[in-house]
């Protein structure tokens, strides 16, 4: 089986490929124009992007959108996590949290696939908290500052093998993989 993931992020492509490998699903990168949908819900963003890209590129197009919701910041950056990361980076986010006792955060990923004009969305969520400083060398994006609930290590410290089993993206894409496998869509 093969799906096409709309991303320009090589780390995300590798991560999704690793997550879907047990389902015997190959992931190739779809070189598509970036779809900018402004909404405060990653599910809506992923759904609309999948609809648009499916109309342009056909079936088995997959889009994911991720948000990081930090309690002390009223849910900021939410679905604007990528933009915030590019503009102020981890140091900027940590500066916003200076003096904050409540460092709880939730990572949410919505993975949407379009087949026959119909979009299915799968959501993965991980609760945790924001570290006081970046830790670890693995992963990408917010991985050095996000500590999943019940753990003491950041995603970056956990290593790829562990992260790809417990992350918000792993939860969303594992659901997508199971859904595709159960429907025998590739036979």
Swiss-Prot record:
Catalytic site = 65 (proton acceptor)
Binding positions (substrate): 7-12, 66, 140-143, 163, 168-169
Q: Where does Mg(2+) bind?
A: 36, 65
**What's one GO BP annotation on this UniProt entry?**
nucleoside triphosphate catabolic process
Q: Which InterPro entries match?
A: dITP/XTP_pyrophosphatase (IPR020922), ITPase-like_fam (IPR029001), RdgB/HAM1 (IPR002637)
GO annotation, cellular component aspect: cytoplasm
Q: Which Pfam families match?
A: Ham1p_like
EC annotation from Swiss-Prot or TrEMBL: 3.6.1.66
Asked if the record carries the keyword Metal-binding, the reply is: yes
Gene3D superfamilies per UniProt:
3.90.950.10
Tell me if Nucleus is a UniProt keyword of this record: no
Co-factor binding details: Binds 1 Mg(2+) ion per subunit.
Q: Which domain of life is it from?
A: Archaea
GO MF terms listed in the record are:
dITP diphosphatase activity; ITP diphosphatase activity; metal ion binding; nucleoside triphosphate diphosphatase activity; nucleotide binding; ribonucleoside triphosphate phosphatase activity; XTP diphosphatase activity
Q: Which reaction does it catalyse?
A: XTP + H2O = XMP + diphosphate + H(+); dITP + H2O = dIMP + diphosphate + H(+); ITP + H2O = IMP + diphosphate + H(+)
HAMAP family per record: Non_canon_purine_NTPase
Stated family: Belongs to the HAM1 NTPase family.
Sum up the protein's function in the record's words.
Pyrophosphatase that catalyzes the hydrolysis of nucleoside triphosphates to their monophosphate derivatives, with a high preference for the non-canonical purine nucleotides XTP (xanthosine triphosphate), dITP (deoxyinosine triphosphate) and ITP. Seems to function as a house-cleaning enzyme that removes non-canonical purine nucleotides from the nucleotide pool, thus preventing their incorporation into DNA/RNA and avoiding chromosomal lesions.
Fill in the subunit field for this protein: Homodimer.
Q: What is this protein called?
A: dITP/XTP pyrophosphatase
- Species of origin reads Pyrobaculum aerophilum (strain ATCC 51768 / DSM 7523 / JCM 9630 / CIP 104966 / NBRC 100827 / IM2)
